[in-house]
Amino acid sequence: MSTPFKMERGVKYRDAAKTSIIPVKNIDPNQELLKKPEWMKIKLPASSAKIESIKNGMRRHGLHSVCEEASCPNLHECFNHGTATFMILGAICTRRCPFCDVAHGKPLPPDPEEPQKLAETIQDMKLKYVVITSVDRDDLPDRGAGHFSECVKAVRELNPNIKIEILVPDFRGRITQALEKLKDNPPDVFNHNLENVPRLYKEIRPGADYEWSLKLLREFKEIFPNIPTKSGLMVGLGETNEEILQVMQDLRDNGVTMLTLGQYLQPSRHHLPVARYVPPTEFDEFRDKANEMGFEHAACGPFVRSSYHADLQASGGLVK
């Protein structure tokens, strides 16, 4: 009889160490991978002073960016543009989604000084728009909602003219309590990603629930009808176009007005493989459908991510 795997608190488990403990065994690290089409090949710019400045500023304050932790392909572009998505509540997630490159494990307690550190870093960077996200923290009674609220409060106190978007987890089992915590310090944009279609949730988002995520988006909108709600999807994981269109309609039916749609990219051989690469023309068609459905803004393209050019998304600019 094998000995149960025991995680050490504060240790990051990645790649095989992370995906090997997922209940649904659907990853063969030795399988042949799809070849990337030409439209998915980008030339990364050389590291610049601005990129290093952002990285050093975050490390100096003990902060994390989802750009680095999730191995985002747009990191160089966004950092060169002077933007970053801050990841609060540590860099260890209590979930182990096999599409995501963020580390899994037993996280450390939240840093009570993080809200102030975050506010000072944003002030130093002279940002006008910021996205704040987090790992899942199922170990916390409020799932981290109170910490989100404190971060928004601290950032606004030092940066009174800034626009704040929060990209939140699903606050599993604690939606009512979480939204109550956010009432005191609401964001300018509320974002929660559905990620993909409900048929694939068991293998893509173990521990999550499609209807629960819709409920979170709907109930936030009911409390704050004038704050835009936003959600993002990845394509290329085995879903059909018809299923994606149905998810888009579900989002509209629950009051969501902003959409992001991008191509899934496999972080490593130990993550879910890409089932297909969606051509740019299909992303254009998805954007047209989104406009027909009544989304106020839809960013659809191979390299689009939830917080990619979020400032342009919020102002209605074309992002693809």
Curated annotation (Swiss-Prot):
- Positions of [4Fe-4S] cluster 1 binding: 67, 72, 78, 307
| InterPro entries according to UniProt | Aldolase_TIM, Elp3/MiaA/NifB-like_rSAM, LIAS_N, Lipoyl_synth, rSAM
The pathway this protein participates in, as annotated, is:
Protein modification; protein lipoylation via endogenous pathway; protein N(6)-(lipoyl)lysine from octanoyl-[acyl-carrier-protein]: step 2/2
List the residue ranges forming a coiled coil, or say none.
none
Q: Name one GO cellular component term.
A: cytoplasm
Similarity comment: Belongs to the radical SAM superfamily. Lipoyl synthase family.
> Recorded E.C. number(s)?
2.8.1.8
Which Gene3D superfamilies does the record match to this protein?
Answer: Aldolase class I
Entry protein name: Lipoyl synthase
Keywords from the named record: 4Fe-4S, Cytoplasm, Iron, Iron-sulfur, Metal-binding, S-adenosyl-L-methionine, Transferase
Q: Could you give a GO molecular-function term held by this entry?
A: lipoate synthase activity
The record lists the lineage as: Bacteria, Pseudomonadati, Pseudomonadota, Gammaproteobacteria, Pasteurellales
Q: What EC class is this?
A: transferase
Reaction(s) catalysed by this chain's protein: [[Fe-S] cluster scaffold protein carrying a second [4Fe-4S](2+) cluster] + N(6)-octanoyl-L-lysyl-[protein] + 2 oxidized [2Fe-2S]-[ferredoxin] + 2 S-adenosyl-L-methionine + 4 H(+) = [[Fe-S] cluster scaffold protein] + N(6)-[(R)-dihydrolipoyl]-L-lysyl-[protein] + 4 Fe(3+) + 2 hydrogen sulfide + 2 5'-deoxyadenosine + 2 L-methionine + 2 reduced [2Fe-2S]-[ferredoxin]
Where's the Radical SAM core domain? 79-296
One Pfam family this sequence matches: Radical_SAM
- What does the entry's cofactor note say about binding and number? Binds 2 [4Fe-4S] clusters per subunit. One cluster is coordinated with 3 cysteines and an exchangeable S-adenosyl-L-methionine.
Classification via HAMAP family? Lipoyl_synth (MF_00206)
**Residues where [4Fe-4S] cluster 2 binds:** 93, 97, 100
Compartments it resides in: Cytoplasm
This protein's superkingdom? Bacteria
Which cofactor does this sequence's record say it needs?
[4Fe-4S] cluster
